[in-house]
């Protein structure tokens, strides 16, 4: 997905306060965005609490439970960060100093990278779970959550290093008119970087995205192939007239395949919106649309996971009935 909120190392456009100040005067854009963020925060909080209670009760966990719980935590923190940043875009506090700008934007960028990483890891772990005993991946099925935690921790350190340039280039917007700074929010701007630094961080980001997305595509194709083979074997043994009940592993796989497809769709849509911003000379409305599109995945993904959990589905149904009766 394209780097949202101008957090990429390339200077995408110059700082123009008057042009982007129109964002916080448009109540429709502001209300739509904060509604999306509110729904995403509530859904990710519910999914995270479910996995915390599941861990406390000592229930048997699947290999993918830790990444799913971690992904909900990452998306929750990511949405909280963008909510704070969005208040300075749509409401315009203009009271943040360098430390606040660096802290919020750096954390947001780190959570955004971890979201991609954890989604990829989730796809790989589900492929391992679904793999047959004869597969070379079967030996990884019984790995403890500590191995997954170590892998996630290592990637977290890597992403923090890749985003470290923001700690230097992010500043509080000075009270002067200039075309040197790049717009992040009403209070925060990015200093231009040298060509060497731009090239280095762009290369690191490109390598990261290509590697993770390629790994995600390979694991997804592997799961699809396994499901197709299993369906053929089932039809051969039981006949086409019967519809055997899907196992929990198969249901989880379908959910993750749906999530991967949705992730790719949102990535393509995000790229299209990003390109349209270039065509329309970085119109503020296109900028707001890109912010909205780039967070649809974090908002929708918990609903995909919760649809596979009977306890959460039953809880939501009972809650809806109570609301309707009231």
Swiss-Prot record:
Residues 1-32, 87-110, 172-203, 276-285 are extracellular. One of its GO terms (cellular component) is plasma membrane. The keyword Transmembrane helix applies. It is found in: Cell membrane. Putative pheromone receptor implicated in the regulation of social as well as reproductive behavior. PROSITE patterns: G_PROTEIN_RECEP_F1_2. The keyword Glycoprotein applies. The gene is Vom1r94. This is Vomeronasal type-1 receptor 94. The chain crosses the membrane at residues 33-53, 66-86, 111-130, 151-171, 204-224, 255-275, 286-306. Keywords: Cell membrane, Disulfide bond, G-protein coupled receptor, Glycoprotein, Membrane, Pheromone response, Receptor, Transducer, Transmembrane, Transmembrane helix. InterPro entries: GPCR_Rhodpsn_7TM, Vmron_rcpt_1. Coiled coil: none annotated. It comes from the Eukaryota. Glycans are attached at residue 175. GO terms for molecular function: pheromone receptor activity. Disulfide bonds join 101-188.
């Amino acid at each position: 997905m394209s780097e949202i909120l101008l957090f990429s190392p390339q200077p995408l456009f110059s700082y123009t306060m008057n042009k982007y100040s129109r964002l916080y005067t448009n109540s429709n854009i502001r209300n739509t965005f904060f509604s999306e963020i509110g729904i995403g925060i509530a859904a990710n909080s519910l999914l995270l609490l479910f996995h915390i209670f599941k861990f406390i009760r000592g229930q048997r966990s699947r290999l993918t439970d830790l990444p799913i719980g971690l992904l909900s935590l990452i998306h929750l923190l990511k949405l909280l960060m963008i909510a704070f940043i969005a208040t300075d875009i749509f409401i315009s506090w203009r009271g943040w100093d360098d430390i606040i700008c660096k802290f919020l934007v750096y954390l947001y960028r780190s959570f955004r990278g971890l979201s991609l990483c954890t989604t990829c890891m989730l796809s790989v772990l589900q492929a391992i779970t679904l793999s047959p005993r004869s597969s070379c991946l079967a030996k990884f099925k019984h790995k403890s959550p500590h191995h997954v935690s170590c892998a996630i921790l290592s990637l977290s350190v890597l992403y923090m290093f890749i985003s470290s340039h923001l700690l230097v280039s992010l500043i509080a917007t000075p009270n002067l008119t200039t075309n040197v700074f790049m717009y992040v929010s009403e209070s925060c701007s990015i200093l231009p970087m040298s060509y060497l630094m731009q090239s280095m961080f762009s290369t690191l980001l490109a390598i990261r995205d290509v590697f993770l997305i390629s790994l995600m595509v390979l694991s997804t194709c592997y799961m699809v192939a396994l499901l197709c083979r299993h369906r053929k074997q089932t039809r051969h043994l039981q006949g086409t007239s019967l519809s055997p009940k899907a196992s929990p592993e198969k249901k989880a796989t379908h959910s993750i395949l749906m999530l991967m497809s949705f992730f790719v769709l949102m990535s393509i849509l995000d790229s299209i919106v990003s390109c349209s911003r270039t065509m329309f000379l970085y119109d503020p409305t296109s900028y707001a649309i890109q912010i909205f599109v780039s967070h649809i995945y974090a908002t929708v993904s918990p609903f995909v996971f919760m649809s596979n959990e009977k306890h959460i589905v039953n809880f939501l149904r009972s809650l809806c009935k109570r609301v309707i009766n009231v």
